[in-house]
């Protein structure tokens, strides 16, 4: 039985005629922005930067979050520290950021703690001493067993600072999952971490990233030299230095092994090719993490979004594409083709559309170019229900109580017989996991309501912001995966007027 501290207060829904409405109110009033009034929040086509590294505000609500609690913790899972394990160049940072993005999407208050960030901060403060970064690269700092006593003390200081911040996150920020991103390559150190967090009533889950595919490893090492450590380095010098880091750790590194120390762990081989699990309780949240790891891939490609033509039709209408629609999709095709180096649409591009006739016909030009085209019913636009075609004034007159609720929470609210953005987010989750599994560029041709949901995932948006973002029909939105964050670019479509 849940306590008052675990579960939000509930009340009966008061939206008459909404046959798909749930029977309880699952959101604390404090978790919804009081200022989220459409009259005071003009929609904008200004897209924010990736928010994955930003600390979550207390009132943050995630797009696929099922409910809110006073404690901030979900699924009765308690506090968990995910401790990454792996040699340099094994994609730990990539994996930890991707996992953080997915967990936040689910509404789990998750923060990233990169040991490299703490090292860079501390060494920047000591540029005039023998502890500057150039000095670190010429001695034993990056070894698991440094011989220099100053280096040992510095590493201990940096780790203590990180651990203190993790504890603060749990105790003062309603945190639920902390992801500790570091090599953590010694069995003895991992046991100390387990015992320490256990004393604080924090569960540990160790995730080791192992790459034994030579081609994948080399690709990941090349990507690793783009880290902040090598911001102004020559690429060849950076590659040599990073390779030396790997060698400095290989001699001492100890894989997770149930015989050596029976820890709760997951070993991921080649980013989801094979998963080994040891001593885990298969609760809901752990199962979601395992399932995500089976789908996660090292990503360096792009996701493109284009509005479909004639997307202002009534929800139930499904006419064929018009001549104007054909002109529009040709311009989309040409603009996208011109953005590639060889000015051609790559055959590896995967195109997703809904199952509506006009979107199927719109994708034909890409199919003719050799692209893989997939039609997904989940990509059908938001169903406006009884609110379809009504002005704000008409909505206020006909559904006054519902209209007031919509103004205060446009993300979760449904009009009678309608869908909410939250419904779309839950419906699209399987496609998000499928998207995570792909290694090729993807073009999604969809209604603006669908694009908002995908954007919210890829840029770690707050749910309250999603209904307010506009994606003009004369732009293709390009979001590119990078190790540390996703980057957005707008490709303007010539010959299409801005709405």
Model-identified regions with their sequence ranges:
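Charged, amphipathic alpha-helical linker segments immediately N-terminal to NTP-binding catalytic cores
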Residues: 2-60
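Acidic, low-complexity terminal tails and accessory targeting/binding regions
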Residues: 3-15, 53-73, 257-258, 274-302, ...
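Active-site-proximal alpha-helix that buttresses catalytic centers in soluble enzyme cores
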Residues: 52, 299-371, 398, 419-421, ...
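Glycine-rich phosphate-binding loop used to anchor ATP phosphates in small-molecule kinases
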Residues: 78, 122, 136-212, 439-440
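Conserved substrate/cofactor phosphate-moiety recognition/catalytic segment
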Residues: 93-167, 384
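Phosphate-handling substructures
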Residues: 130-143, 216-232, 312-314, 320, ...
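A glycine- and Lys/Arg-enriched "phosphate-lid" helix/loop adjacent to the NTP-binding pocket
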Residues: 141-150, 197-255
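Small-molecule kinase domains that catalyze NTP-dependent phosphoryl transfer to phosphate-bearing small molecules
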Residues: 226-294
């Amino acid at each position: 039985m849940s306590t008052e501290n675990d579960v939000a207060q509930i009340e009966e829904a008061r939206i008459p005629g909404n046959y798909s409405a749930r029977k309880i109110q699952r959101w604390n009033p404090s978790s919804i922005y009081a200022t989220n009034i459409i009259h005071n929040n003009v929609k904008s086509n200004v897209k924010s930067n990736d928010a994955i590294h930003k600390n979550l505000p207390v009132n943050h609500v995630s797009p696929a979050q099922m409910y809110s609690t006073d404690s901030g913790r979900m699924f009765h899972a308690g506090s968990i520290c995910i401790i990454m394990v792996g040699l340099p160049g094994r994609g730990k940072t990539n994996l930890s950021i991707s996992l953080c993005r997915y967990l936040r999407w689910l509404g789990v208050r998750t923060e990233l703690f990169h040991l490299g960030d703490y090292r860079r901060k501390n060494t920047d403060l000591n540029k005039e001493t023998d502890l500057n970064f150039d000095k670190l690269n010429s001695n034993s700092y990056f070894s698991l067993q440094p011989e220099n006593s100053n280096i040992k003390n510095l590493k201990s200081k940096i780790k203590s600072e990180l651990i203190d911040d993790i504890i603060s996150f749990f105790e003062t920020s309603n945190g639920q999952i902390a992801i500790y991103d570091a090599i953590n390559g010694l069995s003895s150190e991992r046991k100390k971490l387990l015992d320490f967090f256990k004393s604080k009533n924090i569960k540990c889950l160790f995730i080791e990233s192992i790459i034994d595919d030579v081609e994948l490893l080399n690709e990941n090492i090349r990507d690793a030299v783009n880290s902040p450590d090598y911001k102004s380095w020559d690429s060849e010098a950076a590659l040599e230095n990073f390779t030396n880091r790997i060698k400095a750790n290989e001699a001492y590194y100890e894989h997770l092994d149930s015989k050596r120390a029976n820890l709760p762990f997951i070993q991921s081989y080649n980013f989801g090719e094979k998963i080994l699990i040891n001593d885990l309780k298969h609760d809901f949240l752990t199962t979601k993490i395992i399932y995500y790891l089976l789908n996660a891939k090292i990503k360096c490609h792009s996701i493109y979004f284009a509005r479909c033509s004639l997307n202002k039709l009534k929800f139930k209408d499904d006419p064929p594409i018009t001549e104007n629609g054909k002109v529009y999709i040709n311009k989309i095709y040409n603009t996208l083709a011109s953005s590639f180096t060889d000015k051609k649409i790559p055959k590896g591009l995967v195109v997703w559309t809904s199952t509506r006739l006009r979107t199927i016909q719109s994708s034909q030009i890409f199919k003719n170019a050799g692209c893989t085209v997939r039609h997904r019913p989940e990509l059908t636009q938001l169903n406006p229900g009884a609110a379809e075609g009504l002005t704000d004034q008409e909505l206020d007159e006909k559904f006054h109580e519902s209209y007031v609720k919509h103004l205060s929470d446009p993300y979760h609210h449904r009009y009678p017989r309608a869908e909410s953005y939250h419904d779309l987010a839950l419906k699209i989750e399987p496609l998000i996991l499928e998207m995570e599994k792909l290694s090729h560029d993807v073009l999604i041709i969809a209604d603006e309501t669908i694009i908002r949901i995908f954007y919210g995932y890829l840029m770690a948006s707050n749910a309250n912001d999603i209904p307010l973002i506009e994606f003009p029909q004369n732009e293709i939105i390009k979001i590119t995966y990078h190790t540390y964050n996703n980057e957005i670019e707008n490709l303007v479509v010539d010959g299409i007027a801005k709405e």
